[in-house]
Regions:
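Thiamine diphosphate
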Residues: 2-355
Length: 355
C-alpha cells in the first residue's frame, strides 16, 4: 500500500508519468535515428548491433541487457559505457555484466520480460547459444519478447576452430516454435532485422551477425533492405531461370557473385531467405511469387552450416552446399575456402551438377 501511495504521488510529475506509461507499453521511440551504411563498403554486421542499441538507449527505450563476458566481440561496450553497469552500488545501471554464464543470462532476461517495464537482450557467440538453449525454449513457450544477439555466426570465427564455429546451430534453432531466427545479409539489412526483433511483442528473436566484414549492397540495384520483414524475397531476378540459388546472411554475396559467373550461359534467380519463420507467415500469393520457377530449374542452397533442412526449398534433387562436418582452425577466409564456401567453388559444384 505504501509503495502504491508513493507511486501515485510520483505520477503527478509529468515526466515521470510519461516515462512510467512508456515503460508499461514499450515501443521503439519515434525520435530514433537508425544507422545507415554506404553501398560498396564492407562492414561486419555485429558492428550494427552496437550502433543500434546505443541509439535506442540514448532515446529512452528502457533497454536492459549485456554480454556474457564478450563485450568487445559482441560490440556491446559502447552501450555498457553509456548506461553503466547495474550493481549493488548503482541500481540505475542498465548494462548487466552476466559473466561467462549463458544460461543464467537467458533465465534472467526471461524474468525481466515476465515482470515487464524493460526490454531485455543478451549477447554471446552463436556457438554458445546451446548453453542458453533451455531458457530460449522456455521464452518461446512463454511468448516473451527477448532478443539474443549472436555474433560470430559461422566458420568465419576462424582460428578458434571447431569448438567456436557453429555448424548445426542454425537449423536447430529454426526448429524451435515461436522463435524468429534472423540472419541479415548486410549492414543495412542488419538494422532492419534489429528493428523487427524490437517490434516483437509475443515471441523472442535471435539476430545472427558476422564477425567478418561483408559487402553492403546497393539497394538501388537490389530490393530495399527492409524486405527482410517478409522473411524471404527475390534478391536478384531473371526470366525463365535455369538455376535458382537460395542463401542467407553472409552467403548472399557468394550467391550473387556465382550468378555473375553463370550469367553468360544460364538464367539465375537468387532468393534471400533471411528469416524462414517470417517467410512462412506470408500469404500464399507472395510465397508462390518468390518461389516461382520452372520445374526443370536446378535448385541450389548455400549456407555456412549443415544442409539438412534445405530440402524444404530445394527438393530431393536439389544441390545443397554447406558444411556437414565440424569446422577447422585457420583464418576465416581460408576455412571458408577449405569448405567450398566461395563463388568459384560454388560455380564448379553447380556446373558438375548440371552435367
Amino acid at each position: 500500500a505504501a509503495w502504491n501511495l508513493n507511486l501515485n504521488k510520483r505520477l503527478n510529475d509529468v515526466q515521470f508519468s510519461k516515462d512510467w506509461n512508456l515503460s508499461k507499453n514499450i515501443s521503439i521511440p519515434e525520435n530514433v535515428v537508425w544507422p545507415t551504411y554506404e553501398a560498396g563498403t564492407n562492414i561486419a554486421t555485429r558492428k550494427v548491433w552496437g550502433a543500434v542499441i546505443e541509439e535506442l538507449a540514448g532515446k529512452g527505450m528502457f533497454l536492459v541487457g549485456g554480454s556474457a563476458d564478450l563485450e568487445p566481440s559482441n560490440v556491446t561496450e559502447g552501450f555498457a559505457k553509456l548506461v553503466k553497469d547495474f550493481s549493488k552500488d548503482n541500481s540505475s545501471g542498465m548494462n548487466l555484466a552476466y559473466g561467462v554464464r549463458e544460461f543464467p543470462m537467458g533465465a534472467i532476461n526471461n524474468g525481466i520480460a515476465i515482470h515487464g517495464g524493460l526490454y531485455p537482450f543478451g549477447a554471446t557467440f552463436f556457438v554458445f547459444a546451446d548453453y542458453e538453449r533451455p531458457a530460449l525454449r522456455l521464452r518461446a513457450i512463454q511468448k516473451l519478447p527477448c532478443i539474443s544477439e549472436y555474433t560470430h555466426d559461422s566458420i568465419y570465427v576462424g582460428e578458434d576452430g571447431p569448438t567456436h564455429q557453429p555448424i548445426e546451430h542454425l537449423m536447430s534453432y529454426r526448429a524451435i516454435p515461436n522463435l524468429l531466427v534472423l540472419r541479415p545479409c548486410d549492414a543495412n539489412e542488419a538494422v532492419e532485422a534489429s528493428k523487427l526483433a524490437f517490434q516483437q511483442k509475443d515471441r523472442p528473436s535471435l539476430v545472427l551477425l558476422t564477425r567478418q566484414s561483408i559487402p553492403v549492397f546497393d539497394r538501388e540495384k537490389f530490393p530495399s533492405s527492409d524486405s527482410i520483414k517478409y522473411g524471404g524475397y527475390i534478391m536478384s531476378d531473371c526470366k525463365n531461370p535455369n538455376i535458382v540459388i537460395f542463401a542467407t546472411g553472409s552467403e548472399i554475396w557468394v550467391a550473387l557473385e556465382t550468378k555473375e559467373m553463370l550469367s553468360e550461359n544460364y538464367n539465375v534467380k537468387v532468393i534471400n531467405l533471411g528469416c524462414w519463420e517470417l517467410f512462412e507467415e506470408q500469404e500464399e500469393v507472395y510465397k508462390n511469387n518468390v518461389l516461382s520457377f520452372p520445374e526443370s530449374a536446378l535448385l541450389v542452397s548455400i549456407e555456412s552450416g549443415i544442409t539438412d533442412g534445405w530440402q524444404k526449398f530445394t527438393g530431393r534433387k536439389g544441390l545443397n552446399i554447406g558444411i556437414n562436418t565440424f569446422g577447422e582452425s585457420g583464418p576465416g577466409v581460408d576455412v571458408a575456402n577449405h569448405f567450398g564456401i566461395n563463388p568459384k567453388a560454388v560455380y564448379k559444384k553447380i556446373i558438375e551438377k548440371l552435367k
